[in-house]
């Protein structure tokens, strides 16, 4: 079983410090909102690997996968696909979004 914590990019260093201190933490979910943040998050790959952390991504709160307007709903899917491509080197376990 995995025990995880969540973080945003601005406090990821502090979250990783906690992961180093508490061996039981083996998962981290990082909230990112913009595609350019994929590059910033990718710089932490070595640290994730070193700590043997699985990784999940919390997508922007504004996402609505049940959007009634088809064009907008499809744009969210395209957005998620771009996130996945931008993070392909990180072995993301899942993407999390709220309805």
Where would I find each of the regions flagged by the language model?
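Active-site groove signature of glycoside hydrolases
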Residues: 83-84, 88-99
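N-terminal pre-domain/capping segments
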Residues: 1-88
């Amino acid at each position: 079983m995995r025990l995880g914590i969540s973080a945003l990019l601005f406090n990821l260093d502090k979250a990783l410090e906690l992961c180093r201190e508490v061996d039981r933490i083996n998962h981290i979910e990082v909230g990112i909102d913009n595609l350019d943040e994929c590059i910033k998050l990718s710089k932490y790959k070595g640290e994730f690997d070193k700590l043997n952390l699985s990784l999940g991504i919390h997508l922007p709160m504004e996402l609505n996968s049940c959007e009634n307007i088809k064009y907008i709903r499809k744009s969210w899917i395209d957005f998620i696909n771009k996130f996945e491509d931008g993070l392909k080197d990180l072995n993301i376990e899942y993407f999390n979004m709220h309805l």
